[in-house]
Amino acid sequence: MIGLRPAFSTMLFLLLLTGGVYPLLTTALGQWWFPWQANGSLIHKDNVIRGSALIGQSFTAAGYFHGRPSATADTPYNPLASGGSNLAASNPELDAQIQSRVAALRAANPQASSAVPVELATASASGLDNNLTPGAAAWQIPRVAAARQLPVEQVAQLVAEYTHRPLARFLGQPVVNIVELNLALDALQGHRAK
């Protein structure tokens, strides 16, 4: 029994340290140094939460930029069902999904160039991706501008404005947050697209 006391004391100490002190300390430091990120990077407009800068949303209207397809089951962009489709690149079902998406994208974007950006036809690993490359966003500009009756140049300027660049080139590539961009389009016109 004497040998159990140090083991029990060590276990209790580590339980309090890793189960109490460490989580409370990291939460407090996160709230202090990075409050926006620690609270989910929520986007507020008119004192209402419109979304998160980290999770994509399903935009299907012609007047909105469309993000990557969601691989979440039942409901698109469901954060509770996050995960990829798990279909191998050699799986015929994946090929059929991509071909179907490409055909739908070409039909919805008749003014766009013939080459559909790959990220618009393939789901991300999480199924919740909120970012596109500037090229994939630019590919959709003619459709969005026509649906909103805005000059193409004005929509292109908005895409450029909402393109986030990494601190250094080797840290990643520029991306456009589709949720932020679509909210900016709504703010520009003072209403939601149809």
Swiss-Prot record:
GO molecular function, one term: P-type potassium transmembrane transporter activity
NCBIfam families recorded: kdpC (TIGR00681), PRK00315.1 (NF001454)
Protein known as: Potassium-transporting ATPase KdpC subunit
Entries under InterPro entries matching the protein: KdpC (IPR003820)
Membrane-spanning residues: 12-34
Family statement: Belongs to the KdpC family.
Function: Part of the high-affinity ATP-driven potassium transport (or Kdp) system, which catalyzes the hydrolysis of ATP coupled with the electrogenic transport of potassium into the cytoplasm. This subunit acts as a catalytic chaperone that increases the ATP-binding affinity of the ATP-hydrolyzing subunit KdpB by the formation of a transient KdpB/KdpC/ATP ternary complex.
Subunit structure: The system is composed of three essential subunits: KdpA, KdpB and KdpC.
Membrane topology per record: Single-pass membrane protein
Entry keyword annotation includes Transmembrane helix: yes
Compartments, record wording: Cell inner membrane
Native source organism of the sequence: Salmonella dublin (strain CT_02021853)
Keyword ATP-binding assigned: yes
Keywords: ATP-binding, Cell inner membrane, Cell membrane, Ion transport, Membrane, Nucleotide-binding, Potassium, Potassium transport, Transmembrane, Transmembrane helix, Transport
One Gene Ontology CC term in the entry: plasma membrane
Annotated Pfam families: KdpC
